[in-house]
């Protein structure tokens, strides 16, 4: 499976992942809203939104 693998401040990149899932998580801090994408479906801290999917 190919997932996007980057933070919102970086150029988009992709990565081949063996986990079978991708994630997109977002949170806000002093820099604004940060979006991060990657492989698998990690646990997140309270206040972090996450979406896990088979292709995102």
Curated annotation (Swiss-Prot):
Gene3D superfamilies for this protein: CD59
Identify the tissues in which this protein is expressed. Answer: Expressed by the venom gland.
What is the top-level taxon of the source organism?
Eukaryota
Task: Extract the SUPFAM superfamilies matched here.
Answer: Snake toxin-like
| UniProt subcellular location | Secreted
> What keywords are annotated for this sequence in UniProt?
Acetylcholine receptor inhibiting toxin, Disulfide bond, Ion channel impairing toxin, Neurotoxin, Postsynaptic neurotoxin, Secreted, Toxin
Q: Name one Pfam family in it.
A: Toxin_cobra-type
The family assignment reads:
Belongs to the three-finger toxin family. Short-chain subfamily. Type I alpha-neurotoxin sub-subfamily.
Identification of the protein by name:
Frontoxin I
The record lists the organism as Micrurus frontalis (Coral snake)
């Amino acid at each position: 499976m190919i997932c996007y693998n980057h933070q919102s401040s970086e150029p988009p990149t992709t990565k081949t992942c063996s986990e079978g899932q991708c994630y997109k998580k977002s949170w806000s801090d002093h820099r604004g809203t940060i979006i991060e994408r990657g492989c698998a479906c990690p646990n997140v801290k309270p206040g972090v939104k996450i979406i896990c999917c088979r292709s995102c």
